[in-house]
Amino acid sequence: MRVVLKLGTSVLTAGTDRLHRPRLVDLMRDIAAVSAQGHEVVLVSSGAVTAGWEALGFPPRERTLAEKQLLAAVGQVQLMHLYTSLAELYGLRSAQLLLTADDFRERTRYLNARTTLEGCLSRGVLPVINENDTVAVEQIKVGDNDTLSAFVANLVEADLLLILTDAPGLYTADPRTHPDATLIPVVERVTPDIWALAGGAGSHRGTGGMHTKIQAAEIATRAGTPVVIAPGDLPEALRRVVDGEALGTRFLAHGTRLEARKRWILAEIAHGRLLLDGGAAQAVRERGSSLLPAGIRQVEGDFERGHTVRLLAPDGQELGRGLTRYRADDLRRVCGHHSREIEALLGYTYGEEAVHRDDLVLL
């Protein structure tokens, strides 16, 4: 089994202001035990900024982007040193990969990242992945490591994404304010009712909360990878989940495993939205047809040819994602028009489809 394991700041600090060394030892022992069983583990880890706080003695408060990037630069070295030392203690080698959204957005970089990860796993090396916070600005940030872990699970075609957190899983209500709230053991599909249970933001040290975890679950399960959200303070949580024990909340994968190109389309961050009319929405949803300009009612966002866009039904429901053949401004000029008018309106044509069905992933 190939598992992507995501560790958030709240798990790594055990609720304190510092990295909790005993917790890190336990987690690495768990990873080593699962690896010894023949499973492959990819680790997505937060904690760099906290490690930087700890190393430089900065007081815990909100900081500017430049200060956070400094802390991440210092802390990533400290964090990776800890992981390397602990991995060696249990007979494992480790490797570091720092990624940004562009590494998922641009196909060549996406393929290079996948090749590197496959090489690590084939040689028994534990990849440790974090977002490259020292260079990432808003335009190239994935945003949080929950979402990053879902993209990584998609990238390596993982059999399971395990997100360890400071909560036992997803509840029917916030258990802090609703004592009668109960744990939801299985989620068959992420629906508006599930989103309503997301609650607020995460810990003051991290960037995630239950909302980002549900978002990660939606991304991964759409691509065919099941997701488990479980408490990070449980002994041997990774091994127990891999062995089939029911811990936390399991989000079931739906649909078949997507082919590699369509996994990439789904992983890429969407640059815009196309609002379809009823006929086009029906043709795309029910017949798997390509999207023609005539079926587009509205174009939102600023994107270039080849970028990923969301396709929305008239009621706003997302039907799928696809690679657009035309840039946003040109699509605005041809939307609602017949395909034979494209060349007359634009002075060129890349074909009659706005999004070809081969470049389209239905959700």
UniProtKB/Swiss-Prot annotation:
EC number: 2.7.2.11
SMART domains per UniProt: PUA (SM00359)
Residue stretches making up the PUA domain: 271-349
Catalytic activity annotation: L-glutamate + ATP = L-glutamyl 5-phosphate + ADP
Taxonomic superkingdom: Bacteria
InterPro entries, alphabetized: AceGlu_kinase-like_sf (IPR036393), Asp/Glu/Uridylate_kinase (IPR001048), G5K_ProB (IPR041739), Glu/AcGlu_kinase (IPR001057), Glu_5kinase (IPR011529), Glu_5kinase/COase_Synthase (IPR005715), Glutamate_5-kinase_CS (IPR019797), PUA (IPR002478)
GO molecular function terms noted in the UniProt entry: ATP binding; glutamate 5-kinase activity; RNA binding
Binding site for substrate: S46, D133, N145
Annotated GO biological process: L-proline biosynthetic process; proline biosynthetic process
HAMAP family: ProB (MF_00456)
The protein's role, per its UniProt record: Catalyzes the transfer of a phosphate group to glutamate to form L-glutamate 5-phosphate.
The name this protein goes by in its record: Glutamate 5-kinase
Name of the gene this protein is made from: proB
